[in-house]
Amino acid sequence: MGSMTIREKRKMLEKMKALAKEKDICVLATVSGGNPYCSLMAYATDDDCREIYMVTNKETRKYRNLIENPSVSLLIDTREEHVGSKRPQAKALTVTGLFQIIDKESKKALVRAKLLEKHPHLAEFLDQADAELFCIKVTSFLLLNGLTEAHFEAV
């Protein structure tokens, strides 16, 4: 595909953000000691999709990996809507970013509310002493549209 105009790039970035906001489950990829580790995670985003919010237990490998190496990758996709012969039309959005603990109480309340809005089943988990709210500060989006059409946007 040829180069895109600024307007087309902006429109594509908005499509990527819309997909991230529409979905609520992702695969979080972390690395520790050169070994990759994937976790299925519930998430919510801020309004502009610059931050992706999650919660985890502090006593997990995932959390230790995040502390050791804050660079992460997320996979958000449409495979559930594209089954059988529609599989080639599936979209896969790879989000890269940096892990950051949320420590301000005012922000914790906001993030908690956003997570509960999308995931009411997390209420009990969020109340546990070892539950840690965190965000991924988005650095880029890579959208694979079908099998061959790819779009990358740094943010």
What do these predicted ranges mean?
Residues 29, 44, 55, 75-77, ...:
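Residues in well-ordered beta-strands of folded domains
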